[in-house]
């Protein structure tokens, strides 16, 4: 069989269009298809799948071929526990150089005083953040007060007493239904809730916005050690100067989780008091989502946390992933370009266009609109559960995710809303005109879903009905859009057999 690479090289021969990234990508697929056919075919099928849907899950995006290629190499074979130039293993000088460059790039991009690029995910970054705060603000002062040098010097009885004491310190963060994340401690099954006494704050049910006066009142009453700000499903911006003042007034550390909007900070969309870096003590993020990097985490912090972050291993990590750190460095460098800044601004413009067209179609949005990359549609008035809406949109080629809303009576599994985002479609090059078309398609589908009832007359958790005429029209309109804005256009799907 003629290889993908052979076909590609023949096609571009003499056209001056050769892409080294495409050559490398196709060579890798060729090898896998030949040597490990089932794995190679699954990768090809995933590419086809991603090219056949409008990806509107707010936490997803498309990384560049450069980012992907940086992960596929022998760096994965190297153990490098520790921090740059201070490892628990020998022969790490090349990994040191890569990680150091990644750290310095992160600090320059965000204007941060210190950075740790080792976390494998956003959840790991959040765990490192809370462990760093506990170590810095609770554990170390307690050990010193007891007259010991390190926690390892404590006798067993005093160590157990200190552990019990640490779990009583308070953490105040956004609840899950108000747009917070599982790792913000307000969900008891998550490990974060077991490290501290975690308390929630909620959005105002009338405005669906965070009320800083209410947050300040709760903080003053409970005097938490940590105040968490950030979101995974909240469509407005936050004022970090105000949140910093609330934290200072109650003696709390301000930790900001900017996993969803890090790309908007890097791209210069969130500036001034909307940029958390100058105000927060610790900032965490993923490196995918709006940053368009590999799946991974990143922690940025004030200088006083630098030593603790450099001890991520053994604090809560073992060996980092040097191949992913290399890809993070590539993504962070891409985020420093003018093109990325244009991209970040277009992400928000596209979200606002979606919101405007949805509202013209009579759909209700939480908070009445959006100031960032996402929006949440309240489906209550349509009588359509979020899970059914998710399924029906998936069936016509639009990927979204069901999402709970404040005081959601339907629970976390069924939900009363759906969350949508524009990062991935913007990466494909779509603009406001395309967003109008997308919004009109979605609105028409949502308004024509019939909910199938069970024998007792209650709404089904998994089934909805959409007429074939509406479904076919939606699929064709989606296909037309995807045909004009293909994912990785340099990769010819016709050769992927």
UniProtKB/Swiss-Prot annotation:
Predominant localisation class: cytoplasm
Q: Tell me where it resides.
A: Cytoplasm
List site positions: Plays an important role in substrate specificity: 288
Q: What Enzyme Commission number does this protein have? A: 2.1.2.1
Which residues are annotated with the PTM N6-(pyridoxal phosphate)lysine?
A: 289
Which top-rank group of organisms is this from?
Answer: Bacteria
Keywords associated with the record: Amino-acid biosynthesis, Cytoplasm, One-carbon metabolism, Pyridoxal phosphate, Transferase
Give the metabolic or biological pathway.
One-carbon metabolism; tetrahydrofolate interconversion; Amino-acid biosynthesis; glycine biosynthesis; glycine from L-serine: step 1/1
Cofactor annotation: pyridoxal 5'-phosphate
Q: Please tell me one Gene Ontology term that the record gives under cellular component.
A: cytosol
Under the subunit heading, UniProt states: Homodimer.
Q: What does this protein do?
A: Catalyzes the reversible interconversion of serine and glycine with tetrahydrofolate (THF) serving as the one-carbon carrier. This reaction serves as the major source of one-carbon groups required for the biosynthesis of purines, thymidylate, methionine, and other important biomolecules. Also exhibits THF-independent aldolase activity toward beta-hydroxyamino acids, producing glycine and aldehydes, via a retro-aldol mechanism.
* Cited PANTHER family: SERINE HYDROXYMETHYLTRANSFERASE (PTHR11680), SERINE HYDROXYMETHYLTRANSFERASE 1 (PTHR11680:SF35)
Name by which UniProt lists this protein: Serine hydroxymethyltransferase
- Organism listed in the record: Chlamydia muridarum (strain MoPn / Nigg)
């Amino acid at each position: 069989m003629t290889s993908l690479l052979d076909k590609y090289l023949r096609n571009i021969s003499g056209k001056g269009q050769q892409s080294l990234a495409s050559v490398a990508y196709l060579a890798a697929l060729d090898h896998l298809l030949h040597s490990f056919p089932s794995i190679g075919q699954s990768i090809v099928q995933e590419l086809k799948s991603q090219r056949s849907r409008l990806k509107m899950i707010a936490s997803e995006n498309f990384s560049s071929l450069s980012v992907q290629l940086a992960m596929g190499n022998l760096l994965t074979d190297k153990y490098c526990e520790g921090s740059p130039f201070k490892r628990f293993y020998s022969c790490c000088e090349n990994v040191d150089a890569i990680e150091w460059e990644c750290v310095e790039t992160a600090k320059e991009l965000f204007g941060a005083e210190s950075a740790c690029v080792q976390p494998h995910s956003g959840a790991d970054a959040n765990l490192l953040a809370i462990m760093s705060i506990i170590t810095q603000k609770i554990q170390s002062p307690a050990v010193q007060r007891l007259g010991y040098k390190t926690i390892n010097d404590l006798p067993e009885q005093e160590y157990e007493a200190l552990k019990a004491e640490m779990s009583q310190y308070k953490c105040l963060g956004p609840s899950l239904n108000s747009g917070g994340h599982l790792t913000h401690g307000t969900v008891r099954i998550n490990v974060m809730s077991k490290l501290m006494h975690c308390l929630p704050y909620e959005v105002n049910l009338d405005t669906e916005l965070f009320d800083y006066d209410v947050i300040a009142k709760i903080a003053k009453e409970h005097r938490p050690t940590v105040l968490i700000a950030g979101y995974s499903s909240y469509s407005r911006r936050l004022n970090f100067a105000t949140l910093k003042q609330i934290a200072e007034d109650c003696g709390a550390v301000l930790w900001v989780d900017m996993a969803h909007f890090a790309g908007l900070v890097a791209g210069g969309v969130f500036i001034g008091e909307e940029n958390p870096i100058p105000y927060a003590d610790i900032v965490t993020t993923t490196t995918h989502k709006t940053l368009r990097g590999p799946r991974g985490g990143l922690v940025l912090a004030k200088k006083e946390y630098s030593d603790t972050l450099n001890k991520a291993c053994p604090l809560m990590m073992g060996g980092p992933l040097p191949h992913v750190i290399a890809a993070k460095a590539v993504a962070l460098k891409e985020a420093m370009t003018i093109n990325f800044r244009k991209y970040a601004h277009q992400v928000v413009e596209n979200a606002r266009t979606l919101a405007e067209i949805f509202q013209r179609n009579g759909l209700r949005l939480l908070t009445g609109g959006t100031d960032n990359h996402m929006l949440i549609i309240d489906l209550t008035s349509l009588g359509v559960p979020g899970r059914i809406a998710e399924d029906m949109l998936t069936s016509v080629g639009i990927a979204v995710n069901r999402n709970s809303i404040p005081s959601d009576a339907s629970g976390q599994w069924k939900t009363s809303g759906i969350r949508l985002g524009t990062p991935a479609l913007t990466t494909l090059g779509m603009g406001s005109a395309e967003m109008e078309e997308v919004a009109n398609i979605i609105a028409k589908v949502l308004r024509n879903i019939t909910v199938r009832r069970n024998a007792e007359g209650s709404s089904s958790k998994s089934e909805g009905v959409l007429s074939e005429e509406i479904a076919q029209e939606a699929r064709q309109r989606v296909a037309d859009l995807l045909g004009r804005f293909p994912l990785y256009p340099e990769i010819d799907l016709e050769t992927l057999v």
